[in-house]
Amino acid sequence: MAGVKREFIPNQIFVGLPWKTVRPKYEKIIARLEKKFPLHFAIVGRDDGRDAANLFEIIKERISSSSYAIFDATGGNANVSLEYGYAEGIGVPRAIFLGARKAKQKLTAGSPIISDLAGMRRFQYKTDKVLGIELQKFCRDQDYTKRFEKALASAFKGMSKGTKKRNRALAIKLVRALDKSADMRRSALVQHLQAQNYEEGEVDSLLKKLHNSGVLKCSVGRYAEAFIA
């Protein structure tokens, strides 16, 4: 399936990881990253209320709709190996993270992830702090982040420092509002941000600028939809 053109959400990053042992540290770091970067990290697992029979189908959909995928191979988890193989098969760009403390004792010749790791670049971390630093570097290097920052630099020309700070926070909240759905009615998006103490005029102004820059599409009209582009 590699090489087949696929449609994906430009700012969505799939995260595959051991659910009980590794997920909590990622969720803590991601909560901070999503306040700073325009990326949405998609983690799918049992706690989402989905039964096991449908879980992998949902995971495959999330992988295929993501612009990039991160897999934490700490412990040689079989599910992570399976998800990695699927991402590789459909040509999703991917990165492997590995907890260095457990690497030697867990990644033996019998580990299910070992064949997938052969020859692949890995980001190793010994502490949660190092993991956070590596994930922040990853965020900065993503194509959508670069396009987003370029769009903001253009949109904020001539603004005061305080106005830039307010508008940057608004821009992040705009993309955060679109995390859970492919698109959102423009009117609902504006109302959502008005509830967070933003004026309709400033929301509309930034929507127009982001639309013109191509990082978010939102036409004008009663039934217009907004979506990440």
Locations of the language-model features?
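Conserved catalytic or regulatory cores that recognize and/or transform ribose-phosphate-containing ligands
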Residues: M1-A229
